[in-house]
Amino acid sequence: MSERPSRRGLFPAWLVSAFSLSANGQDWTALREQMVRLQIERRGVRNAAVLRAMREVERHLFVPESLRRSAYEDHPLPIGHGQTISQPYIVAAMTEMLDPKPADRVLEIGTGSGYQAAVLAKLVRHVYTIEVVEPLGRQAQALLERLGFRNVTVRIGDGYEGWPEEAPFDKIMLTAAPPEVPQKLIDQLKPGGRLVAPVGTGWQELVVIDKDLNGRIRRRTEFPVMFVPMVPGKR
């Protein structure tokens, strides 16, 4: 579900125009509230901080203008390059599973539109996020900067390698599905940390991996999901 469909010149036209919607701001606020109540709380997400972040982050700014009216609907949306922004419930559920804390440093694999990073940034000290598709990564970086998210750092690169120079991380989230969780990412998880990821090919399972203080790994499966594959390299 987490497919990943300006400074002028850096921002595409749909993104620039998004910031002229203040006249409809109350409408967007009402739509976010409805999204949280009907799609997220009703499905069992209870973490108050996560719900607050979902209410605060302006999801419609992370989608193309032609799809903005659908931004708060209960499904993923294309954002270009064969990628999508995840369904709101999946964003909230994975964030709650991650159990983010205010002092956490979080690694995200799969920046996409930047929406998941923005939600995490409301909850933790710093988000390090890696995107393999360079145009998407640059676009997300510019938008996050424009929106004032100073605690998000974007890198264009191979998510399979992680971010070793900033490791270890308190939490790691994958928003694309590898066949199996890369050992390099498990190695970059701090003892006492948690990793949440879709795993498998085709239909996948959402997996939670906990590393205890002695470095032992415990793994549990939550529910079936469908994400884009996690591809190596840089595109």
Where are these regions (language model features)?
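N-terminal secretory signal peptides and thylakoid transit peptides that target proteins
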Residues: 2-14
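Short amphipathic alpha-helical segments with coiled-coil-like heptad repeat character
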Residues: 1-3, 62-64, 193-194
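Conserved nucleotide-cofactor-binding alpha/beta core module
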Residues: 99-218
